């Protein structure tokens, strides 16, 4: 079952992906009708839900890849096809202490945090630092911020 405040992913018959956060009075709208968030909350992951016009959607929890592709960003994002090799080549493991320079929108940070790294990051732009922290909190939860120390200043 899902809960309000949680992110969900709907996939339609044409494989289009819709990512949004469930809200108590929220509705998901498309040209194919709408779907009340309260209906989604009562369903299990993998269920097929129907809009008011009968359009079918598969209901899933978004993966990190889904979020990275669709997350709000200020800076250019590192895409999932590059995130995995970066983390492998950097040997990121649970408890690894990482120094990250230039946080951007937080895609690399989220990937390393998901693998259990502890990150100290520097970002010269406050808006990018804020966006990265918001994205981490939105997808990984507030508890992930305890492993993510962000400094708004030049790394030099």
PLM feature segments, named:
Residues 55-58, 64-72, 122-156:
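S-adenosyl-L-methionine
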Residues 105-117:
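Conserved SAM-binding loop of SAM-dependent methyltransferases across substrates and taxa
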Residues 69-84:
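Conserved SAM-binding loop and adjacent beta-strand
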Residues 103-106, 125-126:
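Gly/Ser/Thr-rich loops at beta-strand to alpha-helix junctions
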Residues 1-61:
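N-terminal auxiliary segments of SAM/dcSAM-dependent transferases
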Residues 81-98, 109:
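Short internal alpha-helix immediately C-terminal to a glycine-rich phosphate-binding loop
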Residues 93-104, 120:
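Conserved class I S-adenosyl-L-methionine
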């Amino acid at each position: 079952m899902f809960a309000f405040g949680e992110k969900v992913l709907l996939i339609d018959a044409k494989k289009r992906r819709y990512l949004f956060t469930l809200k108590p009075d929220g509705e998901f709208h498309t040209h194919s009708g709408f779907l009340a968030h309260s209906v989604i909350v009562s369903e299990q992951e993998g269920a097929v839900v129907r809009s008011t016009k009968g359009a079918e959607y598969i209901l899933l929890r978004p993966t990190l890849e889904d979020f990275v592709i669709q997350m709000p960003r200020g800076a250019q994002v590192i895409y999932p096809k590059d995130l995995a090799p970066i983390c492998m080549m950097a040997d990121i493991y649970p408890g690894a202490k990482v120094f990250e320079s230039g946080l951007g929108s937080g895609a690399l940070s989220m990937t390393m945090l998901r693998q259990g790294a502890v990150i100290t990051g520097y970002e010269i732009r406050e808006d990018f630092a804020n966006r990265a922290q918001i994205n981490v909190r939105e997808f990984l939860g507030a508890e992930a911020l305890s492993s993510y120390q962000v400094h708004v200043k030049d790394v030099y």
